[in-house]
Amino acid sequence: KYFYADQYSNDANWQAHYLTTAEEIWTQTKGKITHFVAGLGTTGTFVGTGRRLKELGNVQLISLQPDHPFHPLEGWKHLATAHRPGIYDDTIADTTLIIDSSGVFDIIRSISIHERLFISPSGAANLLGALEVASQIKEGDIVTTLADTLDRYQEVRKEIFGI
């Protein structure tokens, strides 16, 4: 016997973020969040969190996609060339930004040096997206997610740090 979660088509994926991630963000920002920025993989984080944040307030939702199909962002989808997840709702995003995936390793290196955080490639891409949004607005409270750490990406660690 086995269980296949099918996170790309399982409504429980986005519902978990609707019920938990969005509420945590709303509570921790005291409702001051103005922009939510997240990359699209299974799309559960973006769809669930985005739906709930839209209900709670006037939050701009910015989805992120890699700049080409052959990118280093494990888990992310280049939706123009990939199979669209069944749970994806393309009406939710106010804006979609295309992330230059070549800058991801520089962000990982910089954040590790200056903040002592070892973020994953997808986390670095989310951070790039949040920084892009920050450069386009006068003020606001921008939130993104860092879903995992660099621990799972031995080849990336080797390429960036030689370890």
Where do the protein language model's features map onto the residues?
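Glycine-rich beta-alpha junction loops
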Residues: 8-12, 41-44, 65-70, 125, ...
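Active-site/ligand-binding-proximal alpha/beta "capping" segment
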Residues: 3-41, 102-117
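Phosphate-binding loop/pocket of nucleotide- and phosphate-handling active sites
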Residues: 131-163
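Active-site/ligand-binding loops adjacent to catalytic centers
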Residues: 1, 54-121, 136, 157-163
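Glycine-rich phosphate-binding loop signature in dinucleotide/nucleotide-binding domains
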Residues: 1-2, 25-32, 56, 133-140
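Hydrophobic/aromatic residues located in beta-strands of well-ordered beta-sheets
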Residues: 4, 36, 58-62, 142
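Generic hydrophobic alpha-helical scaffold/packing signal
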Residues: 50, 96-97, 109, 131, ...
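Short glycine/serine/threonine-rich phosphate/pyrophosphate-binding segments
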Residues: 40-50, 122-130, 153
